[in-house]
Swiss-Prot record:
Catalytic activity: a 3-demethylubiquinol + S-adenosyl-L-methionine = a ubiquinol + S-adenosyl-L-homocysteine + H(+); a 3-(all-trans-polyprenyl)benzene-1,2-diol + S-adenosyl-L-methionine = a 2-methoxy-6-(all-trans-polyprenyl)phenol + S-adenosyl-L-homocysteine + H(+)
Pfam family of the protein (one): Methyltransf_23
Family: Belongs to the methyltransferase superfamily. UbiG/COQ3 family.
Name of this protein: Ubiquinone biosynthesis O-methyltransferase
Claim: Transferase is one of the keywords in the record: yes
TM annotation in the entry: none
Binding site for S-adenosyl-L-methionine: R36, G55, D76, L120
Function: O-methyltransferase that catalyzes the 2 O-methylation steps in the ubiquinone biosynthetic pathway.
Natural source organism: Pseudomonas fluorescens (strain Pf0-1)
Length: 232
């Protein structure tokens, strides 16, 4: 059985044409992208690295990593977001290879092929996040690093990520997230270790509604990223 939630795919298919509109529903992704790319780049030095972006969507992160000098492959199961990503790279002149394939299927095809694997804002949209994490482990080379980001599962996260972001501030369309699919750092860490990865670092991402700015912080109550390593 494929680890794909077709309702989740349909949700992003419907919005795909606005993926690169910085004032659209995807504004938060555009706003946090520089923070995330810098954090990753500081840890792996993307230039010259072979990178896989799992759940790449319309290519916001994929393009940014390619601009840092990485050779990037982006995979997603959404046909419309991938079409948008392909079109946008013609405009931007950035070269990314995009494929419509699951992480699990690509792991069969390309084990231990990537220096870096990123899987950001994707785990909370699949039926079995641990399956994706295992696939990421299989695809990264020994000594390589895997980065995940998702949303914590607690009352504060519900208040900020769903009530605040979707209903009050309208940063995201209603129904973007399902609270039951949010993932605690302890769960993500445990799944990573079970897959064979070593957790190296964790950082939170906070939003100030007054300044409308995001920043990296020690607070992992809502959005957070983790850095993991496949030991050699």
């Amino acid at each position: 059985m494929s680890n794909v939630d077709h309702a989740e795919i349909a949700k992003f298919e419907a919005l795909a044409h606005r993926w690169w509109d910085r004032e659209s529903e995807f504004k938060p992704l555009h706003d946090i992208n520089p923070l995330r790319v810098n954090w990753i780049d500081e840890r792996v030095n993307l230039a010259g690295k072979k990178v896989l972006d799992v759940g790449c969507g319309g290519g916001i992160l994929s393009e940014a990593m390619a601009q840092r000098g990485a050779t990037v492959t982006g995979i997603d199961m959404g046909e419309a977001p991938l079409a948008v990503a392909q079109l946008h790279q013609l405009e931007s002149g950035v070269n990314v290879e995009y494929r419509q394939i699951t992480a699990e299927a690509l792991a069969e095809e390309m084990p231990e092929q990537f220096d870096v694997v990123t899987c950001l804002e994707m785990l909370e949209h699949v039926p079995d996040p641990s399956s994706v994490i295992r696939a990421c482990f299989r695809m990264v080379k020994p000594g390589g690093q895997v980065f995940f980001s998702t949303i914590n599962r607690n009352p504060k996260a519900y208040l900020f990520a769903i009530v605040g972001a979707e209903y009050i501030m309208k940063l995201l369309p209603r129904g973007t997230h399902d609270f039951k699919k949010f993932i605690r750092p302890s769960e993500l860490g445990a799944w990573s270790r079970m897959a064979g990865l070593t957790v190296k670092d964790i950082i939170g991402l906070t939003y100030n509604p007054l300044t409308k700015h995001y920043k990296l912080a020690a607070d992992v109550d809502v959005n957070y990223m983790i850095q993991t390593l496949r030991e050699e």
